[in-house]
Amino acid sequence: GNGRFIFAGYKTESAPFDAATGDYNGGAEAITQQVDTARNMTISHTGQQIFESITSNAEQLPGGGYGQTNMFKILDSAIASLKTPIENDPAAATAQSQVIANAQIGIKNSQNNVLTVVADVGTKMNELEKLDTLGDDRALGQTKQMSDLVDVDWNEAISSYTMQQAALQASYKAF
């Protein structure tokens, strides 16, 4: 690699997520690049767009709302809950069940968002392949035009020009 962080937007010199807390520290703007004369394309999504967002059709938690949307914090919450002893403690067992149920919904929502981003990346890759093919077609056309200009059969060109000039002179005399 080049030593730069992915998912950090334009802040590629530092880690996008805090390893201890899961907080996003990357840039807010995704990296864009010009891919054609009149087309700029997002070439890298931020970690915030991928791991801290949900889709518009996300499932709500049983009590309403969406709760935590940061995938890492959702997983940390589930892990911490599973580490809590619940033996002979019905209240702790109920609380753990609720945390795990909420985590399942949160992970499903996060996974749907990740799949949406993956689909977006696939669409952009498809567009880049089409732009590449279009560029190859243009290059071939320009090579043919250049060949037509450079590889002229001068005898044929002069003969054709002379015949066209004679036809033009004849049309002038007809009027």
PLM regions and their residue ranges:
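Amphipathic alpha-helical coiled-coil/heptad-repeat segments
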Residues: 1-63
